[in-house]
Amino acid sequence: MGQCYGKVNQSKQNGEEEANTTTYVVSGDGNQIQPLTPVNYGRAKNTPARSSNPSPWPSPFPHGSASPLPSGVSPSPARTSTPRRFFRRPFPPPSPAKHIKASLIKRLGVKPKEGPIPEERGTEPEQSLDKSFGYGKNFGAKYELGKEVGRGHFGHTCSGRGKKGDIKDHPIAVKIISKAKMTTAIAIEDVRREVKLLKSLSGHKYLIKYYDACEDANNVYIVMELCDGGELLDRILARGGKYPEDDAKAIVVQILTVVSFCHLQGVVHRDLKPENFLFTSSREDSDLKLIDFGLSDFIRPDERLNDIVGSAYYVAPEVLHRSYSLEADIWSIGVITYILLCGSRPFWARTESGIFRTVLRTEPNYDDVPWPSCSSEGKDFVKRLLNKDYRKRMSAVQALTHPWLRDDSRVIPLDILIYKLVKAYLHATPLRRAALKALAKALTENELVYLRAQFMLLGPNKDGSVSLENFKTALMQNATDAMRESRVPEILHTMESLAYRKMYFEEFCAAAISIHQLEAVDAWEEIATAGFQHFETEGNRVITIEELARELNVGASAYGHLRDWVRSSDGKLSYLGFTKFLHGVTLRAAHARPR
């Protein structure tokens, strides 16, 4: 909503018929569905808005425009309507309409109406809606519109040029959103949010630059930077479907850098895919720009979203389960990286419901060519991003410090994950904090690289410690209006105990490690064993309650508080019990029968 969607022209070119796709966005309560018009992505190289459509399966080569491929490179047209797994062959994939309609019929017991269905909170009569956005009303005096480069259900996109001010005679792209199409309060709010996101995030090196927003009685105009280097999708196809490993690294680093910035600001993109990254120029070394925030949203650090939105080949399992957060973007980056390295989609099926089923149930293939020739670090990197357990995925910043991408000269950004983990550590039991400290002593260099970088970003005091003020200062130095809108700074209120104490690097390592993430690394068994042996001093492969008390420096009077963590039969804690205990699960709770 509040986005531009291109319309497919029913015509043929070079004997190949154009494919129609219809996008559906299901809202969080599960009983509203909005079909959008068929999509045609105009292949003009100068619009950042053509991927504003959240269509799960855009056709890589729409009709009506010249091929974006370099001279001498021919596209590989699909010969049938059956979707293919290999990314180097464009194809017209299916619409998710049938799958989502069937789900609604099952849920509601009735067939949903055809056409747009107003969302529950936006059922007001159109005449009662306030469509005044407060934007400038002098668009014609400031900008000159050029040719149309894309059209869709809510509006269209044009190239243009500035007529005055800092961007006089500067090429621009203008997204024009029709107010007549804003028939619900939700649609109006979506436009406000998209403009707010673009305005507050603009300025990052790898994010589309926002210039202005205007309106008149009929339309809203969003003025943005014009990128004429084409999409990442076009470059992939021009290279035969995949990138050499070193070239893929350069692309992935740019993607992770801009996504980590968005996540720190409390913004989840929700539609990361090759079509939503534009190159600034046709040069091979030109920068990437992230575009299309039409499906993006603000999110608090501990919030979970439940709207099913995005593109099917890139959607994370937890999105289909209607409970997701920033980790959903990481999954999408994993899919993009998989495609860059091998030229095929990790999750593929002939039908839309089959695509969702493979995302939920199957694992990507790492055995076929070219995976055997890929580096072990590259393969591990993709596996860490495409872990179906979102808790075990790396964050965007952690991915930048992975051995596959590590570069000591690269500046590592601040990670919001650090704040979440330290908050959990401060609220943990003394026994669990002691166990985390034991684990921290066994961390490998791969984990310590990330932790050192984050600790230094907090600006340690002269004595090498950090406190709540350090966490606050570091966060505010990176704050934008988006961060305030997403209420990210509120997490500092849950870390108040740090205002009265200091945290040195050794304890910071214990506080800033995730047990779930450690379980996904190859060295997990060695790390966990080292932590277990820190408590188990008698060499009998179990931890006694006396050993726990000695580690915590408590007397026999405190034994009663420790019995939840040991076996009731013999008062001991095994290695298996220790690993459960690291997750905060007591043995008594683990063995309790549900009533």
Swiss-Prot record:
Give the EC number(s) under which this enzyme is classified: 2.7.11.1
Per the Swiss-Prot or TrEMBL record, the active site comprises 271
Residues annotated to bind Ca(2+) 4: 568, 570, 572
Question: From the record, what ranges are coiled-coil?
Answer: none
Q: Where is the composition biased (Polar residues)?
A: 20-37
The cellular location(s) given in this protein's UniProt record come to:
Cytoplasm; Membrane
Q: What is the activity's pH dependence per the UniProt entry?
A: Optimum pH is 8.
Q: Which UniProt keywords apply?
A: ATP-binding, Calcium, Cytoplasm, Kinase, Lipoprotein, Magnesium, Manganese, Membrane, Metal-binding, Myristate, Nucleotide-binding, Phosphoprotein, Repeat, Serine/threonine-protein kinase, Transferase
Q: Where is the EF-hand domain?
A: 446-482, 483-518, 519-558, 559-588
- Identify the stretch(es) annotated as Autoinhibitory domain: 409-439
Name the Gene3D superfamilies for this protein.
Answer: EF-hand, Phosphorylase Kinase, domain 1, Transferase(Phosphotransferase) domain 1
Q: Which residues bind Ca(2+) 1?
A: 461, 463, 465
**How does the UniProt record describe the way this protein sits in the membrane?**
Lipid-anchor
Q: How is its activity regulated?
A: Not activated by calcium. Autophosphorylation may play an important role in the regulation of the kinase activity. Stimulated by magnesium ions (optimum at 10-15 mM) and manganese ions.
Domain comment (free text) = There are 3 contiguous domains conserved in the CDPK subfamily: a kinase domain, an autoinhibitory (junction) domain and a calmodulin-like domain. The autoinhibitory domain (409-439) inactivates kinase activity under calcium-free conditions.
What is the official name of this protein in its record?
A: CDPK-related kinase 3
Q: Which organism is it from?
A: Arabidopsis thaliana
